[in-house]
Design a protein with these regions (language model features):
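An acidic-aromatic
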Residues: 56-104, 161-167
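Bacterial N-terminal signal peptides that target proteins for export
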Residues: 1-9
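Short, exposed beta-strand/loop patches in secreted or surface proteins that constitute
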Residues: 34, 57-61, 74-75, 118-124
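Non-transmembrane domains of secretory- and envelope-associated proteins
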Residues: 125-128, 135-142, 150-199
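Hydrophobic helical h-region of N-terminal Sec-dependent signal peptides
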Residues: 9-15
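Short, hydrophobic/aromatic-rich segments at coil-to-beta transitions
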Residues: 39-44, 62-68, 125-132, 151-156
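N-terminal leader/targeting segments and the immediate start of mature chains
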Residues: 2, 15-53, 64-65, 90, ...
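Flexible, surface-exposed loop/linker segments and immediately adjacent secondary-structure boundaries
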Residues: 97-127
Length: 199
């Protein structure tokens, strides 16, 4: 009798875990839908890490494209090519970034990564869902995403990369109608910048 009770309890725990995992995926799916707004979205952010310190900036996103601006650099990504203007050096580096590179630069890149071999878990904290993603042999080993329950807007993203945690806090999230031209570097706007092609 005790063995049967233990087995039933074990099955119920497994089922509860599966249902909880489905809920985490549903929350991430809804969040991806919000962030992937057809016209685009804009937000402010603060990035904190022991390795790089703190950086504030703004980001505009439309599909896989993004444009980020901080005091140190401006980044354009058109879905394939990335241009990074380093303000201090007046130079533009051009490359085709990897998924891990994009995650380090675009905090919302998780909306494409979470379906690729990550295990989910979820808890709640006040008016937020807290979704944890863990993956083996990934550039980003773990992500903890805090998502507002009513709006499904991500308000904080923590990433574990190379044994270092980076925290990204997001504010002023809003939908927008963004032109594709803002996601490409315009050399006319930076006539004196040195362009270094790393592709």
């Amino acid at each position: 009798m005790e063995k049967i009770r233990i087995r039933i309890t074990g099955v119920l725990l497994l089922l509860a875990g599966a249902i909880y995992g489905q809920n985490a995926q549903q929350v991430l799916d809804k969040t991806a839908s919000v962030v992937s707004n057809k016209g685009g979205v804009e937000a402010s952010f603060t990035i904190s890490s022991k390795q790089y310190g703190n950086t504030n900036g703004t980001i505009a996103i439309k599909g896989r494209k993004f444009h980020a601006d901080t005091n140190e650099a401006t980044v354009w990504f058109d879905g394939k090519t990335q241009w990074t203007y380093v303000k201090q050096n007046d130079e533009v580096n051009v490359n085709n970034p990897t998924a891990a590179d994009l995650q380090a630069i675009n905090p919302y890149n998780f909306i494409y990564m979470y379906k690729q071999g990550y295990a989910f878990s979820m808890s709640t904290s006040g008016n937020s869902y807290v979704v944890t993603l863990k993956g083996k042999d990934k550039g980003v080993r773990e992500m903890v995403i805090t998502i507002h329950k009513q709006t499904y807007v991500p308000t904080q993203i923590r990433m574990l990369q190379n044994k270092q945690w980076t925290t990204i806090k997001v504010s002023n999230f809003r939908t927008a109608k963004l032109s594709d031209s803002i996601f490409r570097f315009n050399p006319k706007s930076y006539p004196n910048a040195e362009v270094i092609d790393l592709r």
